[in-house]
Amino acid sequence: MAADAVAKGFTEYYYNAFDTNRAGLAPLYRDVSMLTYEDKQFVGAQNIVAHLAGLPFQRIKHVVTKCDAQPSHPTNGSILITVMGQLQFDDSPAPMPFVQTFHLYPEGANNYFVYNDIFRLVLH
């Protein structure tokens, strides 16, 4: 499957799960997975999902405005994805821009897990 198609399917699934049930993201991560969320770093699926599920808002909505993807290794099938978009949470008055980068690592036929995940709000 082409990197763009994987990226499209992955990001649709990821942000839908994030917006509706953050604990439901657990199957996407493994013990070797790493997350940098703003300036905080987390390693391992349990720590990553605990952080995401514990973020201090009740409702959130991500809108992806751009998603770019490339193969990131010539033979192992891993994929690098960069997402730009806006998010709005709880009763925030205006959407906030964000950028997020995922490194997906293959696990079996047409299956991937998140090896690296870097999230940053774009604040000036």
Language-model features: where?
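Eukaryotic beta-rich interaction modules
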Residues: G9, I81-M84
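Short beta-strand edge/turn micro-motifs at domain boundaries
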Residues: T75, T82, Q88-H124
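Short, low-complexity N-terminal intrinsically disordered segments enriched in polar/charged residues
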Residues: M1-N16
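A solvent-exposed, acidic/Ser-Thr-rich amphipathic alpha-helical stretch
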Residues: D31-G77
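Generic structural signal for secondary-structure transition and capping sites
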Residues: A23, F57-I60, A109
